[in-house]
């Protein structure tokens, strides 16, 4: 049927689904035109798939139940940039095979909508499309927008410690019912602006809209990475090691040296996570998860508060272990004399260097220690 009607045809060596524009041997053109009229109505409101199927069942069309879903799927493929499918009122940016299987059995659960954007609204879509590097049509833009936010970690979706605009944009996208309404009405309202009407384009309004939207989206995108850095610096500060990546590397070096000598059953697993992980990032994620008893990407605001409370407890244990650890304990009497002489020599050299920043001194010593460790590692 699809080939005979011309809906599926070969174009330049490739088979494609195309819209019908002239009479065909199968008499599908009137059906296609009725589907176009039904789906591309005067409003953006979705219309019932069951209602569409009932309409096409009746004279003068008389399309059988088995053919109806096939025609609908072809129609949505041909007009994929201008149509949307809904399941129980929820937008399906990218319908799956499972969705279509349900539609075959329960068409009453689904609705469909279509729109052709022109005028000022088209300029808005084109601006989105340039930023997302996608086709200048509503559905491709909305798909990228929703996919980007849905891919963010659980923490970003659950925290309320973000700006008002970021919270509103997140909720608006999550509850989107219509792609057209999302772009031209719901998102502007979420950003405390008037909806975009299909009339003369107000460039200042457009710039303000995208400035607020981009700020909110950037904040959402950066929220979980920000949390990781915050957790790292909270822990380091409590341990008296400063802040930043260099200080974290210093902590990991200390953990390697300290772990074999620690007996505190609560602190030891934390030190082992820092000492035995493959890299600094993995070690950091593992340590934060241990302190809060949950991976940081899944933290709620309550988990963040729990982490803050526990940090001081673990840091106190760390400082006590560090203070009680005597590196010379494993050395012979002769080795102790040698190590003290070297330490005194280094102390005098550092005094001559007149280093006033303790952070610089710690990092320098850490680098030297790492080089010495690397030199004595067995070569494979």
Where are these regions (language model features)?
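Intrinsically disordered, low-complexity, polar/charged repeat-rich segments
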Residues: 27-28, 46
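Charge-enriched amphipathic alpha-helical scaffolds
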Residues: 30-34, 53-93
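Short acidic, hydrophobic short linear motifs in intrinsically disordered regions
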Residues: 43-56
């Amino acid at each position: 049927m699809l080939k005979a009607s011309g809906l599926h045809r070969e174009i330049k060596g490739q088979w494609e689904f195309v819209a019908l524009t002239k009479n065909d041997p199968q008499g599908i053109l009137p059906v296609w035109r009725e589907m176009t009229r039904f789906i591309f109505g005067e409003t953006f409101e979705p219309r019932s798939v069951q209602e569409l199927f009932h309409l096409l069942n009746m004279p003068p069309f008389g399309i059988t139940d088995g053919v109806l879903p096939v025609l609908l799927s072809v129609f949505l493929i041909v007009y994929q940039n201008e149509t949307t499918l809904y399941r129980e009122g929820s937008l399906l940016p990218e319908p799956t095979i499972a969705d279509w299987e349900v539609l075959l059995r329960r068409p009453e659960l689904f609705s469909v909508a279509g729109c052709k954007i022109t005028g000022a609204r088209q300029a808005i879509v084109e601006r989105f499309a340039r930023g997302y590097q996608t086709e200048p049509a509503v559905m491709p833009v909305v798909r990228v927008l929703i996919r980007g936010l849905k891919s963010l970690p659980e923490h970003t979706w659950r925290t309320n410690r973000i700006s008002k605009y970021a919270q509103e944009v997140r909720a608006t996208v999550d509850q989107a019912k219509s792609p057209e309404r999302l772009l031209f009405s719901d998102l502007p309202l979420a950003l405390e602006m008037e909806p975009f009407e299909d009339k003369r384009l107000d460039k200042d309004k457009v710039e303000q809209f995208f400035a607020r939207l981009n700020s909110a989206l950037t904040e959402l995108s950066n929220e979980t990475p920000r949390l990781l850095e915050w957790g790292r610096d909270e822990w380091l500060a409590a341990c008296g090691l400063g802040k930043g990546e260099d200080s974290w590397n210093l902590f990991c070096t200390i953990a390697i040296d300290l772990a074999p000598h620690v007996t505190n059953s609560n602190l030891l697993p934390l030190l082992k996570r820092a000492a035995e992980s493959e890299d600094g990032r993995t070690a950091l994620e593992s340590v934060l998860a241990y302190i809060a008893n949950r991976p940081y990407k899944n933290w709620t605001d309550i988990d963040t508060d729990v982490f803050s409370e526990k940090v001081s407890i673990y840091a106190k244990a760390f400082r006590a272990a560090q203070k009680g650890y005597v590196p010379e304990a494993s050395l012979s009497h002769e080795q102790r004399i040698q190590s003290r002489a070297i330490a005194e020599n280094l102390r005098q050299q550092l005094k001559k260097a007149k280093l006033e920043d303790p952070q610089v001194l710690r990092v320098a010593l850490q680098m030297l220690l790492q080089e010495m460790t690397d030199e004595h590692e067995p070569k494979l």
